[in-house]
């Protein structure tokens, strides 16, 4: 699946929510969204998921296979939920890199983890998932939670993640996906396009950012499509686990 389409002037375009925009503008528009929501990102995660995001992330950690001494890269790591847990798992002989393209999110994550006193083995790096600034065959595990849908060229990002993994290393992609039954799909549509923007307006005074987030979820590849993208990028043994009736899916692949 490609993210590129051609407009009438032959300029490459891609989706930003339901809108079609020049590729060169998407990253800037996504950045504006996350600059806006960074300060209350954790609160909104709890409100909008009813706290379920913590269970989804816990399952991700369980399937990661991360252990003492490992190197872990958490892409789009935002406010540091996964990084904090991985920091404890890898211990003082391991390393966690929390990477995010958005400076505001990275600052919130750094400040939050420093306040918790768990940042001793965590490095904070502002980085683009499509062009990761790390050596080949460097990490034992790479994770990206609720970030891949915001990437312009998803195939490039997945290949970049493959490159930085060691042979036998694991990629875990936690992302909103396609509900597995029609009733849940209808309920989820109402929730996404009515409740999410309303809560965004009430809590952050920003309905538009949460309208974009709802739209971006609908534009993200479904479970089977993302699995195929990971296989085509070069990953082996790609599987996925649906959670909460497919509202969220966790994909896992191994570097040969």
UniProtKB/Swiss-Prot annotation:
BP terms from Gene Ontology: aerobic respiration; menaquinone biosynthetic process; methylation
Family: Belongs to the class I-like SAM-binding methyltransferase superfamily. MenG/UbiE family.
Protein known as: Ubiquinone/menaquinone biosynthesis C-methyltransferase UbiE
Function in brief: Methyltransferase required for the conversion of demethylmenaquinol (DMKH2) to menaquinol (MKH2) and the conversion of 2-polyprenyl-6-methoxy-1,4-benzoquinol (DDMQH2) to 2-polyprenyl-3-methyl-6-methoxy-1,4-benzoquinol (DMQH2).
Pathway: Quinol/quinone metabolism; menaquinone biosynthesis; menaquinol from 1,4-dihydroxy-2-naphthoate: step 2/2; Cofactor biosynthesis; ubiquinone biosynthesis
Superkingdom classification of source: Bacteria
Keyword Phosphoprotein: no
Keywords of the record: Menaquinone biosynthesis, Methyltransferase, S-adenosyl-L-methionine, Transferase, Ubiquinone biosynthesis
One GO molecular-function entry: 2-methoxy-6-polyprenyl-1,4-benzoquinol methyltransferase activity
InterPro entries: SAM-dependent_MTases_sf, UbiE/COQ5_MeTrFase, UbiE/COQ5_MeTrFase_CS
């Amino acid at each position: 699946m490609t993210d590129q389409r051609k407009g009438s002037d032959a300029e490459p375009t891609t989706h930003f929510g339901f809108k079609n925009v020049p590729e060169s503008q998407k990253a800037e528009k996504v950045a504006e969204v996350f600059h806006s929501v960074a300060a209350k990102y954790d609160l909104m995660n709890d409100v909008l998921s009813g706290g379920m995001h913590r269970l989804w992330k816990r399952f991700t950690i369980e399937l990661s296979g991360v252990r003492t001494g490992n190197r872990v890269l958490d892409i789009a790591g935002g406010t540091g939920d996964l990084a904090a847990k991985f920091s404890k798992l890898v211990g003082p002989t391991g390393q966690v890199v929390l990477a995010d393209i958005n400076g505001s999110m990275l600052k919130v994550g750094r400040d939050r983890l420093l306040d918790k006193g768990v940042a001793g083995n965590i490095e904070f790096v502002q980085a683009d998932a499509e062009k990761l600034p790390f050596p080949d065959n460097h990490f034992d595990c790479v994770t990206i939670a609720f970030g891949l849908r915001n990437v312009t060229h998803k195939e490039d990002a997945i290949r970049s993640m493959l490159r930085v993994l060691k042979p036998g290393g694991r990629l875990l992609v936690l992302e909103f996906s396609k509900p597995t039954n029609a009733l849940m799909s209808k309920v989820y549509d109402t929730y996404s396009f009515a409740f999410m923007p309303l809560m965004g307006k009430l809590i952050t005074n920003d309905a538009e950012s949460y309208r974009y987030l709802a739209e971006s979820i609908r534009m993200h590849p479904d479970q089977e499509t993302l699995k195929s993208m990971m296989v085509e990028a070069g990953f082996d043994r790609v599987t996925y686990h649906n959670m909460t009736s497919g509202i969220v899916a966790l994909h896992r692949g191994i570097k040969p």
